[in-house]
From Swiss-Prot:
The keyword Methyltransferase is annotated on this UniProt entry: yes
Subcellular location: Cytoplasm
Protein family according to the UniProt entry: Belongs to the methyltransferase superfamily. tRNA (adenine-N(6)-)-methyltransferase family.
Alphabetical UniProt keywords: Cytoplasm, Methyltransferase, S-adenosyl-L-methionine, Transferase, tRNA processing
One matching Pfam family: Cons_hypoth95
Uppermost EC category: transferase
InterPro entries recorded: DNA_methylase_N6_adenine_CS, rRNA_Ade_Mease_Trfase_CS, SAM-dependent_MTases_sf, tRNA_Adenine-N(6)_MTase, tRNA_adenine-N6_MeTrfase
PANTHER family assigned: TRNA1(VAL) (ADENINE(37)-N6)-METHYLTRANSFERASE
SUPFAM superfamilies found in the cross-reference section: S-adenosyl-L-methionine-dependent methyltransferases
Protein name, as recorded: tRNA1(Val) (adenine(37)-N6)-methyltransferase
EC number in record: 2.1.1.223
Organism, scientific name: Shewanella pealeana (strain ATCC 700345 / ANG-SQ1)
Annotated catalysed reactions: adenosine(37) in tRNA1(Val) + S-adenosyl-L-methionine = N(6)-methyladenosine(37) in tRNA1(Val) + S-adenosyl-L-homocysteine + H(+)
Amino acid sequence: MPFTFKLFHVDDSRCGMPVSTDGVLLGAWAPLVQAKTILDIGAGSGLLSLMAAQRSLAKITAIEVDTDAALDCQQNFNASPWFDRLEVICCDIQAYAQAHTQVHSQAHNHAEQSKQFEHIICNPPYFANGPQSSNVSRATARHTDSLSFDSLLAAIKQLLSPEGCASLILPTESVSLFETKLSTYQLELSQKLLAASVEGKEANRQILVLRHTSALAHDPKTETEPAVVAKLEDAAQQQLYIREKNGQYSQAFSLLSRDFYLKL
């Protein structure tokens, strides 16, 4: 159903996955660190791209494989205040990475190197087993058949700039498998946020921030904006819960999302 935020509107009526708290949490918390270029993998309705556009001055490319979702995404971009910094491309991320590698190689006539982004953001599909929805768009958005962890990490390795970072949100039960694959793609975890739905519950979601292995040896925070520094310090505690036991949003989540939600 359509969802109105403070500065933009999201129509997700044709998307396999509707606007969710997961997406809002990732979009609000991801350490953009003044990124000038951002890639949104599996953009859906464009929520993450729109949140990133509100938080930054970056040029943002959204990749969405589902035609109907890409139409919603384009419509939402066109209606936003940042339409001139947002683009959506309807294709899968593997095809996008391959095409940009070839174009760059032909233009520069040297070893392959992709167009790269300073930040990559993704709310990926994570169900590896179990029955799939009869709704093709929903199945694509939720199951790793459409984008495996290996394919996603290969794309991040190829498309992430040397000093850039990638932010992803996963269910806690999927994190161990995901993390075992990082070294294969010369990626390492630089930050992690554990998020619980309710105070006192175990974390059911985790935001992982990845960087190239070589980037971790020289990772000064000198250019990090003050607002982001505070978030990174909070992330070091590796905890955040969305709601208090009384059902109200927690102070931490309210602070993160108050620039977006109408009623905060």
